[in-house]
UniProtKB/Swiss-Prot annotation:
This is Riboflavin biosynthesis protein RibBA. Residues 200-397 are annotated as: GTP cyclohydrolase II. It catalyses: D-ribulose 5-phosphate = (2S)-2-hydroxy-3-oxobutyl phosphate + formate + H(+); GTP + 4 H2O = 2,5-diamino-6-hydroxy-4-(5-phosphoribosylamino)-pyrimidine + formate + 2 phosphate + 3 H(+). One of its GO terms (cellular component) is cytosol. Keywords: GTP-binding, Hydrolase, Lyase, Magnesium, Manganese, Metal-binding, Multifunctional enzyme, Nucleotide-binding, Riboflavin biosynthesis, Zinc. The record marks H124, E162 as: Essential for DHBP synthase activity. It comes from Bacillus anthracis.
Amino acid sequence: MFHRIEEALEDLKQGKVVIVCDDENRENEGDFIALAEYITPETINFMITHGRGLVCVPITEGYAERLQLEPMVSHNTDSHHTAFTVSIDHVSTTTGISAHERATTIQQLLNPASKGADFNRPGHIFPLIAKEGGVLRRAGHTEAAVDLAQLCGAEPAGVICEIINEDGTMARVPDLLQCAKQFDIKMITIEDLIAYRRHHETLVTREVEITLPTDFGTFQAIGYSNSLDTKEHIALVKGDISTGEPVLVRVHSECLTGDVFGSCRCDCGPQLHAALAQIEREGKGVLLYMRQEGRGIGLLNKLRAYKLQEEGFDTVEANEKLGFPADLRDYGIGAQILKDLGLQHLRLLTNNPRKIAGLQGYDLTVTERVPLQMPAKEENKTYLQTKVNKLGHLLNL
């Protein structure tokens, strides 16, 4: 049904367009993608005629800095945190909207001699800043476009356009397959691109391994660094996890207030302890402790969110009030650590369906969701109910 990544790369190198699909539990859409280096008015016209979506240009942070492309908004509350910059037109264009002038703007964006002053703001081309690390960090079309360009040896920038059906609905896989057949276009998935990159590179390094006796039992503690940021993560491993059988796994995001101080605002501490105890009872398993404080927003911002909750906002509203998505965690680094440990099939201790989708997008298989529900307390009843109502957590309250 889908083509190999190598086939798509060959077409992209020839200036052709490919279709890239993301996870059905994410945006569940397909985009036309081309290399910005080879963009032509004809390609732009094809995209806007048959794609019907917004034409955007994924770029690296370096392009944005060189051309002084500021974020479109100061607080990005998009559910997928797509990093739009201010839109632009090259100063040589007139209205900037024609296929020819949009292609001109893209070509000049890549021109190493271009400066920030060479572009009018706002305009008709929408640059998007890809996360460093690409789809291994964030499984989005923005990162896929830049990754594909880099794998082709081209300038690290792409041109993308969402594919919309003639009736105005989003094109899903059956529609995209028909489109690919109609125009003889290669079609790939971000999941396959992740798998392709994983075979060629890694972002995590196993640094040190020790024996760690705990109140719950004795574990092997393995420390990891990663090349994306300065965060250090730790995996607590129990028993022989190399048998190929599904392994009990808990991916636990750091919560200083709950894990260390016993905060009753959340259920993180009890979940951590219960997971360790359950892994000990099983005789084998992994607890992966990720330094993603406050669902990824950091300790101080989590405390600021708590302050807003004291003023009547719920946990999701507080994050959004601070300019963050409800959940800023990404699972790419965690997935790489689990893969480094030799895991493929997981019995995942979680109440969060998004965590399952997040890990499965990185070539891991969740064979079973193992509930990890803690008794609610008066102080966290509202918090837990919000996680059910707004974040889709599976809890019986």
